[in-house]
Amino acid sequence: MPGSPDEPVPNNRPEEISMTDKHTGACFCGAVTIEVTGKPEAMGYCHCSSCRSWSAGPVNAFTLWKPENVTVTKGREFLGRFKKTEKSDRQFCTKCGGHIMTDHPTFGLTDVYAATIPSVAFAPGVHVNYSETVLRMKDGLPKLQDFPAELGGSGVVVPE
C-alpha cells in the first residue's frame, strides 16, 4: 500500500518501528490518553474537504492503525464522537475539544492524528484525495486522486 512504513519514503528519515513498540498520546488537555502498539499500516496526508474542515487546516497528517492496536488508556468518559458519514467516526475530548482519532469502518483502520502521538516519527508515504487539495505540496510522494485501489478508491495517481 502506498504510504506503508515498509515502503521507502523519499525526503524523509523513517524510524524503525517494531511490532512491539508502544507509543502514548493525549488530547490537548491530557484528559484522554491513548496507546498505539506495533507499527502503523500507513502514514500520509489527506486533502479531502471533510478532513480539512475537521482539522481546521489545509491538510490532515494521518497515521493509520489496525483498530486492535489503538487503546484509550485514560479518560474514556471524556471521549466524544461525531459521525458525519458512515465512513468516519471522529473522536475528540469533550473537555478541551482536542481531536484524537477517527475510526474508518469501511477501511477497517483507525486514523490517529500524527500530532496526537509525537513519539512516532511521522514518515508520510502518500497523499490521498489530492484532487481536493487547497495546498499543493511538491515533496516527491505519490498523489492519489482519491484512495488506493485496495481501500476501494481508484488508485489513480495525479500530477504534483
What are these regions (language model features)?
Residues 8-160:
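A short Gly-Trp-Pro
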